């Protein structure tokens, strides 16, 4: 029994703990395991005053090697350690249902991993400091999939989104939003290929409907806006300026039989001055 109230029971050599032994401190901390010249070395288990435990390998008094740590909160980690920190391969599981299985560096979840979130989503790929960063794929139980380059937990760079209804997007993303150049395809067969801004069609792009309708031109905030050309399912071709998807102002339409109208439009309807041939 030491002056500080600690109590040791076990083998000694030269007045030092050596071999198998149990140390119990006044604050409730205990260690039961191997000792070498007064230092924890080999296999041992500690129990903290709050009930948390670690059982596994020790080197020179420090947690190094393989072991299992269970925190008072119920959080459980099994895997590699270095200098008392998670390091190498390991699995972390929380009572809430979160699970991380993969690489650790000096206590940080960094490297390649499979993460199961509490909502059932599963991510497989690169992780930096616990956040999705690098190349990876997320599959959500609601049916959608996110795949590509990640930064700080969001798709950032080139990626692919597959919605639960079968709609897809493949192209540039910024913080999870479609932004830059990309191609969207609906489950019905409609496609849009062009520029995006803040998750909306914006800039130059081409829409092709499964019914044969097509628009090529300028877009703003998700709608045809500016100079563009429409090809209708019957083969008619209209060139005009568009506002909120409707022709507005001067334009020209050529019908399948070769006849034309060139003149003014208002809210998608021929109205004003014009000439038909």
Residue ranges and their predicted role:
Residues 20-25, 48, 71, 140, ...:
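Solvent-exposed, well-ordered amphipathic alpha-helical segments
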Residues 3, 95, 111, 185-187, ...:
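N-terminal compositionally biased, intrinsically disordered segments and leader/signal-like regions
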Residues 7-18, 30-41, 53-64, 76-87, ...:
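Conserved anchor residues at repeat-unit boundaries in beta-strand-based tandem repeats, strongest
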